Amino acid sequence: MMDGRLLEHPHAQFGGSLGGVVGFPYPLGHHHVYELAGHQLQSAAAAAAAASVPFSIDGLLSGSCAAAAASVVNPTPLLPAACGVAGESQPFKLADSGDPDKESPGCKRRRTRTNFTGWQLEELEKAFNESHYPDVFMREALALRLDLVESRVQVWFQNRRAKWRKKENTKKGPGRPAHNSHPTTCSGEPMDPEEIARKELEKMEKKKRKHEKKLLKSQSRHLHSPGGLSLHSAPSSDSDSGGGGLSPEPPEPPPPTAAAKGPGAHGSGIAGSAPVPPGEPPAPGTCDPAFYPSQRSGAGSQPRLGRPADKDTVPCGPGAAATAGLPKASPFSVESLLSDSPPRRKATPANAAATAGLDFTPGLPCAPRTLIGKGHFLLYPITQPLGFLVPQAALKGGAGPELVPKDAPPAPPAPPAPPAQASFGTFPGPGGAADPAFARRSPEVVASPGPPAPASFRDLTAAAAESGAGDCADVGTVCPAASPPPPLETSPGPGPRAPSPPGEPATCGAAEPGAATGPSPPEGEEVDMD
């Protein structure tokens, strides 16, 4: 280890000893001594002291040439002449006491940083305030008075002038400090605390004003945006949601007089209708405000084409009469958007019946027209095949159970005998099963096939021929062209029917459950003749 440290420093003061250890083939001259640096000389002296004598703090910390010469076992005569050590000067002080280049040209070393004391800096600042460019005589006087070297004083003045120029060139406006400004003066003295407090106060006030302005702007934007959104979205919500279908507020029940007011109301013609099973969704023809966007509470009652005027005034939805006078809340307002309840799309049949105050589910539709072919977009998916969207004819009055077209002549009443109805309802088709085109009135009669009764059938068909309209025209319905029955008598089934009024769309049931066409949804409600 020690030999390795000795090999790292093959310097001149160890010429004799290193020559014996390493065996250099040439002697070391004086020019090798001039290449030494100060820190290398210190480390070499410490290594030599550690190799010759036991470790000691003095041997490790001594940095002078005299200590190195005393610790070397075989000193060479080159050492005192090389470093020029007379014992009175020590060139390795932290604060420069002289210029080593002038006093000892043989010992070239790296100059350490000069540490100025506080009173030295004060004297230098006073001299700088008097003159930025002192002459050589003034610098010499400062160096003698401050125990410094004239070259250090000259370098300090150069740095001080550069700092002063930089500060002068980078001055900004009155409110913005320079990028290199600190709360100290150029001489390192602390700034006036009042000045620092004033600058900090200005900075805080400026930041506070900026924050208040930003907060006020955000509040004004927040106040303006919901109002404008609700104003602009009110008509669009009317057109998009039929009768407030998107609003989370539950619909209010209609007044009790609305149920029995008009011919198209719920309670007028429901007595003979069969209730819809609770498991099936309601047909689009029922009184659901979602399927009829043209009947809106906000737009008023708009008369429809091809319908009597009295049908348009009838409230269709449960909350139509209640919401007609009240301003509808926008579905995009802050209250409706933040409410936890989901938007009510469509009421279930049980809920609709309970809301309307009915003891059973309404089966007859209130508005028979559907959205197909009217140019509207379907807001909700169709839950039934298109073949079973069967609108029913609304009853004209609640007094008479029988439906008669307005333009047809009065027909003689049908015989009320149950055998005649049974034989008419069970007239066999071509395959021997019950004919769906002539299925009538009550399901128990249809379900029990019996032998045909030609006499009663002839009476009924003769009465229908006299009236000039088919049997289906008596009840206000149009049956599809069915297969001709066995040749008993010419029936007006395949022939042209008397058209129903436009206000009463016709319907006829599909195949019966017992027929060969397979299972199908329940057919449209029929009105009993009795």
UniProtKB/Swiss-Prot annotation:
Instruction: Provide ranges: composition bias, Pro residues.
Output: 248-257, 275-284, 407-419, 482-504
According to the entry, DNA is bound by residues in: 109-168
**Where in the cell?**
Nucleus
Region (Disordered) spans which residues? 90-111, 165-360, 400-530
Q: Which keywords label this protein?
A: Developmental protein, Differentiation, DNA-binding, Homeobox, Neurogenesis, Nucleus, Transcription, Transcription regulation
Q: Which GO terms describe its molecular function?
A: DNA-binding transcription factor activity, RNA polymerase II-specific; sequence-specific double-stranded DNA binding
Q: In which tissues is it expressed?
A: Expressed in the paraxial mesoderm, in the developing kidney and central nervous system. In the somite, it is restricted to the caudal half of the newly formed somite and sclerotome. In the central nervous system, it is detected in the developing spinal cord, hindbrain, mesencephalon and telencephalon. Expressed in adult and embryonic magnocellular neurons of the hypothalamo-neurohypophysial system.
Pfam families annotated for this entry? Homeodomain (PF00046)
Which intervals carry biased composition (Basic residues)?
A: 206-224
| Misc. remarks from the entry | Marker of antero-posterior subdivisions of the somite.
Query: Can you cite an annotated GO cellular component?
Result: nucleus
Compositionally biased intervals (Basic and acidic residues):
195-205
Which organism's genome codes for this protein? Mus musculus (Mouse)
**Family affiliation:** Belongs to the paired homeobox family. Unc-4 subfamily.
> Which InterPro entries does the UniProt record give?
HD, Homeobox_CS, Homeodomain-like_sf
Q: Which GO terms describe its biological process?
A: cartilage condensation; common myeloid progenitor cell proliferation; dorsal spinal cord development; olfactory bulb interneuron differentiation; pattern specification process; regulation of cell differentiation; regulation of gene expression
Extent of Low complexity compositional bias:
230-240, 433-448, 462-474
- PROSITE patterns in the record: HOMEOBOX_1 (PS00027), HOMEOBOX_2 (PS50071)
Q: Which CDD domains match?
A: homeodomain
Name-wise, this protein is Homeobox protein unc-4 homolog
Q: What does this protein do?
A: Transcription factor involved in somitogenesis and neurogenesis. Required for the maintenance and differentiation of particular elements of the axial skeleton. May act upstream of PAX9. Plays a role in controlling the development of connections of hypothalamic neurons to pituitary elements, allowing central neurons to reach the peripheral blood circulation and to deliver hormones for control of peripheral functions.
Q: What is its main location?
A: nucleus
Gene null: resulting phenotype:
Mice die perinatally and exhibit severe malformations of the axial skeleton. Pedicles of the neural arches and proximal ribs are not formed. In addition, dorsal root ganglia are disorganized. In the hypothalamo-neurohypophysial system, neurons are viable and able to express neuropeptides; however, the connectivity of magnocellular neurons with posterior pituitary elements is compromised.
